[in-house]
Structure formats: C-alpha cells, structure tokens
UniProtKB/Swiss-Prot annotation:
Domain-level remarks: Terminal protein domain (TP) is hepadnavirus-specific. Spacer domain is highly variable and separates the TP and RT domains. Polymerase/reverse-transcriptase domain (RT) and ribonuclease H domain (RH) are similar to retrovirus reverse transcriptase/RNase H.
Name this protein carries in UniProt: Protein P
Signal peptide stretch: none
PROSITE patterns: RT_POL
Length: 556
C-alpha cells in the first residue's frame, strides 16, 4: 500500500469527495513506488528535541498514502497545470495560534496577459471625519457570509485547481531513493527538523490528527466555494456592500449607514433605537439570503472603531494599538547607524499611518522619503529621532469641516503678498523673488496667523491640495503646523480681492465674493445618494426571497 503523491506537474487527476483532491502513483528507476517521506521519520532516530520523529511516532497507524473515496467530478477538460499555490498565514497579527488559507493567484497579475482590477474609491481621512464624526451610537456588522460562501459550479472546479506541496517542498534536494540508510541523505531529511516546522506540525496535528499524514504529501484541490479574488474582486466587494448600505438607508432613513469593503457600520441616536434597527436589519438580510454573524457584531457606543481609527464627535484619532506599535518601533531605531532603504520603507509605512495626526504631518518624513527614492542608506541622528518621538507622542484629532462662508482671501506674486478681509487689506514684499507656489504658501500662513480664520480663499492649486512635500523641508513642516485644521476654497484670480494688494496696490474695500465651503465628502461610490422612497408603495411587494435560506438548494 505504499503509494507516492505527485508533485504539482501531474498528468491526470481524480477528485475525491472530502476535498476534491487528486493523486497519482509515480515510480522510481527500479519500477517500485518510493517510500513515503512521512513514514521515513518513523524508522529513524530523533535528531533532537524538535525532530519530526516525535510527532510521527505518536501514532502507530497513519493510514495509507492515498486518499480513498468516490470520485465526484470527472471532466475531460481538466487543464494540465494548476491555477495557483496555497499557503497559510496568521489569523491576525495578534493571533498566531490560528491561521487562514491564502491562495496565490498572482500568475494572473503578471506578463502581457495580466488582468487589471478596476479602480475603486477609498474614503480619505477628512471624508471619514465629515461623515462619521457625530454623537451617535454605533455598531459594526459582519456581512462576510454574504460573499465569502458563493458556491461554484462543479463543471468549473477543474479550472481553479490549487496545489499544496506538503513537506516535500522543503526537501527539493532529496531524491526519490534517499531512504535506504545513507547517513548523509538522512541528514538532508532531518534538515526539516526546525523549531518553526515542528511547532507548525504540532499545531496541525492537534487539529487534524491522523489526517496530517495526507497533508504532508503534495496534493491538488478544487474549490467548492468561490475564493476571494475569483468570484468577487475588491471593486465588486465595495459595490456589493454599498448596495447593502443603500438598501438599509432607503428602508431606515433615520439612521446612518456607511460601508467600506467588508466592513459595514450602523449608527443611531440612542442605543435602544440602534437595537431595534439592528433586529429589523437582521430579518431583512435573512430574507435576502444573507446571514449576519451575531457573535461578530461589535457594539461601539459613542466611540466608533472603523478602518483602524477611533471616530468620536470630537474628531478622528488612530487606535491605541497602532500608536503603541509605532512608539515601540521608533524607540528601537538605532542612532548613527546606516539603515537599508528597505527598512526605511517599512518604517515609513508605519509612520505614515499616524502622520496626519501630528503637527508637522507628512513633511516630517521627507528625509526618509528622499533616502527611499534614491535607494540609499539613511542614518538617524539623535536629534531627528527625538524630534520624531516628540511629534508622535502628541497627536491631534482630525475634526469635521463646517459649512461656513469664506471671509479671508490670500494671494501672492514672486515679489509680494496680499491679504483681504471684510474690514482691511494687508500687503507686503519679500526680500528676494520666490517661486510662485512658495510665495502663495507663505501668504496663506500669514493670513492664518494674523486673522485666525479656519477657511481661506486662494487661487493656487498646490496650496489647495494640501500636499506640501514638494516645498523646502523646514517650510513644509512649519506650514503644516500653522495650517493644521485650516480649509481652503478656490477663487479665480480675477475675483480674488487679494490680487491687487499682492501687487502693491491698495484699492478701495469692496464686497467679498460669497464663497461657502462644502464639507468634503468626495465622489465615492461608498456614499452614493440613495433615491427617495416613494410614499405610496405598491400593494404586492414580496420580501420573501426565491432563494431558500433554511435548506440547501439541490439541483434536479
């Protein structure tokens, strides 16, 4: 009964009922099946405390090396290659005892035949603050059952084959005739016996028991449910949850619903109101065939945890776990030692997440950006490290914008600046000519310092964008500090009342153009305006779904 499970370059596959797996027998040069690698550990002596022999010897009967069972799928169109590889990753950064299955379909993203994902909108930080920074009661719904369990047609299973190499991926240098007592070949086999492999196999043994023998062999699997990325792209996932949110808004117009990818949040004025809405939504979703996971529903109260942020009525801040991790990493950075730019990339990615909540914003990380762009090593000085620590220890919330009328305008020329308010005109000159974008930024900073206005009118697109990383480093840091919490609205140069003062002319005060700030909500599909509900609904409205939600659908 010694049979060998093939590597991934198989010729013909049979599928069994438990996991739709396929195996064939491969013979060595002598015409006999080679011995199973898993059973070889049973006949050897342990090489140490982390030897796989300890796991293998815990059972006397590991069963045959083949999967038995009735073949449920026989397709003559089975392709002669697998679709992707499969591997395990941690459940989340805080839980390494559980794992989730990840399938590698990256071959479809390479070469001239690669498939591009459609672009989908991502809400920025200011949009989240404007939409969700309210004094409401919140809860998060887990709707993953709606799109993670889409059944696949049996005829399409052979086109999504996935291979697992088992233990033999680690022993590529181990030939098929190495189990004959050769010491050097046994040492090659015992190269698997590491602490990481031993702990992983021990965890799998506690879960699967005797089935671990089959997992140690290469095998080929097919899907019974569509995997993420095949049946549902990120774009379609965002559209799907947006449709669910729009449906909830139409039927419950007195609540707030927001969706991003697989995360859907629901808000109401009181907890009692929220509980009533939640019970109704559960029944409505169940009629649509969507089972909400009640155990994963999280009640947040006034502090909504969404996309890694804590959103309250006072603004948006990052979650404490991100701040603590960032502080720990930043304190462990060595001083006066060159760091590879790849390390700087990972550190900058962590710092970027919290940068909008610091006084200097992204501009404080410009030295790291330059080192990464030039692919050179970066040396942290003690002064720069202590400055970053002081910046990231004091975080300021991103507050929601208010719809107010603009009463302060700023403009500049390469040689001068001008400020116009409802009651005065101010102007000045620079010591030497400056680039126009730099001059406009300085004029906006002066207007903010002298008037304290939270809304400024300007005609420069660079200042309007708020991206100051293209300016000189110290100027960008100071401008971020001064203009923090300041909004901008665009005014054409011909209508800008600060245009003439910036040229050294002080005309008579005239009425200012009436410009009102519209809080930024971005044109995103995630917050699409729902059509109003007709006050007179038709009589014959059936909420019952044609899909059976209690019993599985069996084809005729």
């Amino acid at each position: 009964s010694k049979r060998y499970s093939p590597p991934l370059n198989y010729e013909k596959s049979d599928f069994s009922s438990p996991g739709v797996r396929g195996r064939i027998t491969r013979l060595d040069n002598n015409g006999t099946p080679p011995q199973c690698l898993w059973r070889s550990f049973y006949n050897t002596k342990p090489c140490g405390s982390y030897c796989i022999h300890h796991i293998v010897s815990s059972l006397d009967d590991w069963g045959p090396c083949t999967v038995t069972g009735d073949v449920t799928i026989k397709s003559p169109r089975t392709p002669r290659r697998i679709t992707g590889g499969v591997f395990l990753v941690d459940k989340n950064p805080n839980n390494s005892s559980e794992s989730r299955l990840v399938v590698d379909f990256s071959q479809f993203s390479r070469g001239h035949t690669r498939v591009h994902w459609p672009k989908f909108a991502v809400p920025n930080l200011q949009t989240l603050a404007n939409l969700l920074s309210t004094n409401l009661q919140w809860l998060s719904l887990d709707v993953s059952a709606a799109f993670y369990h889409i059944p696949i047609s049996p005829a399409a299973v052979p086109h999504l084959l996935v291979g697992s190499p088992g233990l033999e991926r680690f022993t590529t240098c181990l030939s098929s005739s190495t189990h004959n007592g050769n010491d050097s070949q046994l040492q090659t086999m015992h190269a698997l016996c590491t602490r990481h492999v031993y702990s992983s196999l021990l965890l799998l043994f506690k879960t699967y028991g005797r089935k671990l023998h089959l997992l140690a062999h290469p095998f080929i699997m097919g899907f019974r449910k569509l995997p993420m990325g095949v049946g549902l792209s990120p774009f379609l996932l965002a559209q799907f949850t947006s449709a669910l949110a729009s449906m909830v808004r139409r039927n419950f117009p007195h609540c707030v619903v927001f969706a991003y990818m697989d995360d859907l949040v629901l808000g109401a004025r009181t907890s009692e109101h929220l509980t009533a809405i939640y019970s109704h939504i559960c029944s409505v979703f169940l009629d649509l065939g969507i089972h909400l996971n009640v155990n994963k529903t999280k009640w947040w109260g006034n502090h909504l945890h969404f996309m890694g942020y804590v959103i309250t009525s006072s603004g948006v801040l990052p979650q404490d776990k991100h701040v603590k991790k960032l502080s720990r990493y930043l304190r462990s950075v060595p001083v006066n030692q060159p760091l590879d730019y790849k390390i700087c990339e990972r550190l900058t990615g962590i710092l970027n997440y919290v940068a909008p909540f610091t006084l200097c914003g992204y501009a404080a990380l410009m030295p790291l950006y330059h080192a990464i762009a030039s692919r050179t090593a970066f040396i942290f000085s003690s002064l720069y490290k202590s400055w970053l620590l002081s910046l990231y220890e004091e975080l300021w919330p991103v507050v929601r914008q208010r719809g107010v009328v603009c009463t302060v305008f700023a403009d500049a020329t390469p040689t001068g600046w001008g400020i116009a308010t409802t009651c005065q005109l101010l102007s000045g000159t620079f010591a030497f000519p400056l680039p126009i974008a730099t001059a406009e930024l300085i004029a906006a900073c002066l207007a903010r310092c002298w008037t304290g206005a939270r809304l400024l009118g300007t005609d420069n697109s660079v200042v309007l964008s708020g991206k100051l990383t293209s300016f000189p480093w110290l100027l960008a840091c100071v401008a971020n500090w001064i203009l923090r919490g300041t909004s901008f609205c665009y005014v054409p140069s011909a209508l800008n009342p600060a245009d003439l003062p910036s040229r050294g002319l002080l005309p008579v005060l005239r009425p200012l153009p009436r410009l009102r700030l519209r809080p930024q909500t971005s044109r995103i599909s995630l917050w699409a305006a729902s059509p109003p509900v007709s006050p007179r609904r038709p009589v014959r409205v059936a909420w019952s779904s044609p899909v059976q939600t209690c019993e599985p659908w069996i084809p005729p």
